[in-house]
Amino acid sequence: MIQDTIADMLTRIRNANAMRIYTVCMPMTSVAREIAVILETEGWIDSWKEASVNSLILRLKYRGAKQQPILTGLRRVSRSGCRVYVSAKEVPKVLGGMGTAIISTSKGIMTDREARNHRLGGEVICLIW
């Protein structure tokens, strides 16, 4: 059984990117679904869909003739053994605003930009660039 579903999701995306695979299948949780929505709205993935009750399929994006991945890096920040919380003033900017931080706040899971606009802090789930 998977202990950290978010880390598993990020690892599956990272491995598929390295192999230039277009679709990734993973177990579906409510947090994974919300992260998939954020990845799609921010333009990091092409699309996502629920394949069944228990699985989620992401379609990854590549650019150019050499099929370079849009996602160059994914990093899990807050883990089960070491939680990382930030205040509204400490919300991280990834690569000076070129990347995205996904933060779990009291108003739900959102990007770093949304958290700054709403003046919310929370748990930093992962960084994407």
From Swiss-Prot:
This is Small ribosomal subunit protein uS8c. InterPro entries: Ribosomal_uS8 (IPR000630), Ribosomal_uS8_CS (IPR047863), Ribosomal_uS8_sf (IPR035987). The keyword Transmembrane does not apply. One of its GO terms (biological process) is translation. GO terms for cellular component: chloroplast; ribonucleoprotein complex; ribosome. Coiled coil: none annotated. Its main location: plastid. Pfam families: Ribosomal_S8 (PF00410). Part of the 30S ribosomal subunit. Keywords: Chloroplast, Plastid, Ribonucleoprotein, Ribosomal protein, RNA-binding, rRNA-binding. One of the primary rRNA binding proteins, it binds directly to 16S rRNA central domain where it helps coordinate assembly of the platform of the 30S subunit. Belongs to the universal ribosomal protein uS8 family. GO terms for molecular function: rRNA binding; structural constituent of ribosome. The keyword Ribonucleoprotein applies. It is found in: Plastid, Chloroplast.
